[in-house]
Amino acid sequence: MFVQPQTTETLIAQAVFITALAMMGFIYAGYPALMFALSHIFRRPVRRDDITPRVSVIIAAYNEERDIAAKLKNTLELDYPRDRMEIIVASDCSTDRTDEIVRGFGPKGVTLYRQPERFGKTIAQNRAVNVSSGDILIFSDATTMYEPDAIRKIVRSFADHEVGCVAGQLIYVDASSSAVGKGCSSYWGYEKFLKSCESRMGSLIGVSGCMYAVRRICHARLAGDMIDDFVIATEIHLQGLRTVYEPEAVAVEDTNHRSKDEFRMRVRVIKQTLSALRRYRQALNPFEHKMFAFQMITHKVLRYSIPFLLIAALIASGWASGAVDWLRFAFIGQLALYGVAVVGFVGERLKIKIGPLAIPYYFVLVSAASLVAFLKALYGETYIVWEPIRDAHNVNPSPETAASHDS
């Protein structure tokens, strides 16, 4: 049987598709497998001890009248010596009853720091640090609830003098079983696995902004458009110290239930991370920063290239689908993936549960957010202030409720 030789175009299309697929495979499967192996070969144990340093819990808030009272009650009930813990609410010029509610907790030792103008969360945190007195600074959000022993667990790693920052475990609660919530929970389970591996062998490259602690002497004043979740770990690394993961220090928070809220949040976070990567590009030098640079490049830079790899794979397989059988099937498979995303989008609007289809739906949503964030970064758009996400379904979860939802 005569086999028609492939043209240069089809050979290029196959090469592009295979390269894109291989890169995505490494990003999502190869990197976790590599980190898992390396973390068991080059393990760096953290020395922990039951210490009780003086801590300052700094709670960032903007128009949080619905949740701030519950957050403060939760914080006051934490199992930590009250004379060793101060609580400061950093209000970013709230216009609702947030400040009034916080003042009501004044007799219980809660301090309100109010910004005279709205400068954003990062600036509010910087200024709250200036009026704090703790040796350990613990940063939280108004919608995040801590388990009773969370502070005791998170500070014990500071017995190790090589540790400058500790990230707790954030558990997302999907109370409404929404498609976005299920996808977020699955994604976060994957991220926590990576955190465990990265921490075992060295240092994290990011923390959860609502649950991390840092030595006062290591805290860096960040620019208003920087995202502390990512930048703090880089700052700590540049000081020669580690950021480690403490999974026993648990906080819980409700997931977003609407795709538009999750999309908006992801665009903002990714855009700010891209800006931070550009500002801290010296940390991407593998000759100087070795494994930390490798983690940054793979876990962040390559991860955010996913939408471009998806586009390249789709175009390449579509271009040669008429000439190469296996590319035709690959093209159909990709169309099916995006079809599932459409089903998820429609299902969310119709309040239909889509079960396991939530994962591909969330994958496409986050990939689209990465693309939009890249374009915003390209055009120089910055985020300093933003509106907190409000959802009638979001209620403050208790740690007990969240326990069964940890993914």
Mark where each language-model region is.
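N-terminal membrane-anchoring/stem segments of glycan-assembly enzymes
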Residues: 1-51, 199
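A conserved acidic beta->alpha catalytic loop
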Residues: 81, 91-100, 117, 144
